[in-house]
């Protein structure tokens, strides 16, 4: 069996981020223990959907994607974001599994009410949201990373199959830094704060 794993990290606030890529590689390596072959690729290296500023890459995308699919011949595809790449996989009739790491629908709502208030940007958000809904609806299965998100998926796509994907974190890959001098008792919080609304909650700590 062959599984194509596609990492969508690398755009927006996660530009040059490798964290999610490492997690997907670990998953792929684990699959090999069960005689499953995998290929891990960066989504933007093979396909860019519309709207985009990279028109040259957009027009050459389908050719690159066709070559990738024809050479690797995947039995299934796992993507970690809801984009045109996933939509193209659905159109080709290949089973698609969508990894969902956050409350996508809340993110869209918050984005339109804060940083994307202009008519043009709101339209772009709407177009991408429409693509995402098609990906969710047409996927073989949605894989939220926790039970809470599974309930959220059921609210938006009640008939779609979903199961919790326990990703886990390998702390051996963390960068070492000098410790902080803390006054005990204290509480530590670790957060991947690359989404604006999530960082807002940290302001609560100023009052604690």
Pin down the residues of each PLM region.
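Helix-loop-beta element that forms the nucleotide-linked donor phosphate-binding surface
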Residues: 150-169
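Acceptor-binding helix/loop patch of EC 2.4 sugar-transfer enzymes
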Residues: 47-51, 98-130
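Conserved donor-binding/catalytic core segment of Leloir-type glycosyltransferases
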Residues: 4, 143, 180-200, 205-206
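Membrane-proximal helix-turn-helix segments that form the acceptor-binding/catalytic region
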Residues: 63, 67, 119-142, 156
